Amino acid sequence: NYQQYKSTAFVSQTGTAMLGWVVPATYQYSGQGSYQQGQKLARERLVSALQRDQLEKLPASPFENSSYRANIGKEILFEFGFLNILKAWVTGSAINLFAPSVAFSPALRSMEHPSFYETKGSGIVEKLFNYIKNSSGFLYLFILAIGTIISVIFIMLVLIGVFKMILILSPIKVATILILLGYFLIVTGPIVGVKYRLPIEPLLIMFASYAILNWKKIN
């Protein structure tokens, strides 16, 4: 990358991800409007930035292009404010933690269903309501409902496991694991999808297993 484009960046998709995913998702999950409105906002700000900087088009270099888009995305996020960003990040993390793993199953995805990202709604509650309302397949919704219940039980076991570990194990060990878990949640932010939970699945399973083992010892 440095030899061809004089860039030390590893990838040239940061700007696209920022304007195409992070900004719209933050806009939506902070309760400011729908995902589609967030996408429109990002496009309009890109056009106005080009006019402001007196540019006819984006830089030819993919890395300069990405950097330009990313900077616009950062400007928009700063305008949203810390509380809106925090709300969007917490909401996105909660969705990724509680979303049923079966949602990413090829068999389930092959069933007729609406796109979660394309479903309109200002905020997660309205979006989920519209998603359920627009889903015509009973079997699809039934499987998702069962999967969600299992996910909720699993996360409850995880929380119990964390609490038990804090009481018994070294605080440094538990803190290190929680920091690692938190890192992946922060990096993912408001971008939702079951696949983004994969890096932390081993940690979640460890906490849940610890809770079950403690329950077995007591009984």
PLM feature segments, named:
Residues 1-3, 164-165, 180-194:
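Transmembrane-helix signature of polytopic, lipid-linked glycan biosynthesis machinery
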Residues 80-83, 87-180:
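Membrane-interface anchor segments at the N-terminal boundary of transmembrane helices
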Residues 9-120:
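Membrane-proximal stem/loop segments at transmembrane-domain junctions that anchor or position
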Residues 26-27, 188-194, 210-217:
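Juxtamembrane membrane-interface segments at transmembrane alpha-helix termini
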